Every structure is written in C-alpha cells, then in structure tokens.
Design a protein with these regions (language model features):
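RNA-binding basic/glycine-rich loop and surface signature characteristic of RAMP-family CRISPR effectors
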Residues: 1-115, 130-191
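Internal, well-folded beta-alpha domain core
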Residues: 119-120, 124-125, 141-143
C-alpha cells in the first residue's frame, strides 16, 4: 500500500496540548495500519462490489469470507497482518539514526518525526473567521511511504479479493478532507 497523500491512521488517543489525533506507531516509532481495520474496509467494499455486480450469493460470500458481524466465533476464512514498513527500511532507518544521534536520543521519537508530520485544522464561521476553540492538530503519516501486509485466504476467494482491493482508494481518518489516498499493489506468494 503506497500513500499517495498524507494519511491519518488514528490510534484513538490524543496528546494533551500537542495532538488531538495521533497515529498508530509501534514501540520503535514506526507508523502502521491495523490489519483488522483494513479487513473492515475490505468487507465494506466487498459488500458494495458484490451488490454492484448483482451477485445473488453476496450475503453468504461475505459471511464465509469475513465471518458474521458481532459474532466471536472465528469462522472467517481471510486473515490480514498489520500493514508495516518493510524490515529493510526499518533496519536502515534505525542504523542511520543511531549512527547520527547520541545514546540519550529518543530513537522512537526521531523515527516518528521522520515519517509523520503535524497538520492543523480549524472551523471557519460564516463571517470567514476561525471559530473560537476550534483549532485541532493531527499527526499524519507522510505521503510516499509504502506499507506491506500479508493476506491469507482461500484460493477460490483470491480473484474477488484482488478485484475489490483495486477499488479501494481511500483509508484512514479525514478522507473527506483529502487525506488517505492510497494505491494498492498485490504480489502473490505461493507456499
């Protein structure tokens, strides 16, 4: 998944006095996107796609692939790992930052700062003036970053999944504000 625009993978947390919306980062400071969140996006897009093509078995296919909503019985036949940077990129960043910084530097914070940026938002009144108390700050993952995930599914579902993934163009928070434009590429790996 390549980020075509800045993206907000919200983590549901805020940093008082700094960020109203933060991004998901691992313990090393690298941003990532939850596979389970993407699975929800794919489920929604699959429902739309099957409805659009007029598939009479849409409901059964959805439940077989993704399980039944609200049901904890793990009957689904599709699995997604989290979307992460490549191990090569992560290793090179850690090596380079460690080489350049002193031993007291917060490497995780430096990594996060390299891969993300802060954006400010405000509401504008009818008079064209910023509304009082409306300033918000969000941390965004920089456009151009690529993430990788593994998808495990039944062979009979591969083509449908490929077709639907090609239709996904936006993910994350604030998509209606121009954030979250993505491009997916699929590489098959045989076992």
């Amino acid at each position: 998944m390549e980020l075509i625009s800045d993206v907000i993978f919200g983590n549901g947390m805020s940093v008082p006095g700094a960020e109203d919306t933060s991004v998901l980062c691992d313990e090393q400071g690298f941003p990532y996107y939850k596979g389970s969140t993407f699975k929800g996006v794919l489920r929604e897009e699959t429902e739309r796609y099957l409805e659009w093509i007029g598939d009479s078995e849409a409901k059964n296919k959805i439940e077989k692939m993704f399980g039944m909503g609200g049901n904890d019985n793990k009957t689904e036949q599709i699995y997604f790992s989290d979307f992460k940077l490549s191990p090569y990129v992560k290793e090179k960043m850690i090596t380079e930052i460690t080489r350049m910084e002193n031993e007291t530097a917060d490497i995780a914070e430096i990594i996060k700062e390299c891969l993300t940026n802060l954006r400010t938002f405000t509401s504008i009144s009818k008079d064209g003036v910023a509304k009082k108390g409306s300033l918000r700050i969000a941390r965004c993952v920089n456009k151009g970053v690529s993430f990788y995930s593994d998808i495990v599914c039944e062979q009979e579902q591969e083509q449908l999944i490929k077709d639907v993934i090609k239709t996904i163009k936006w993910i994350g928070t604030k998509r209606n504000r121009g954030f979250g434009r993505v491009k997916f590429s699929i590489e098959e790996v045989s076992e």
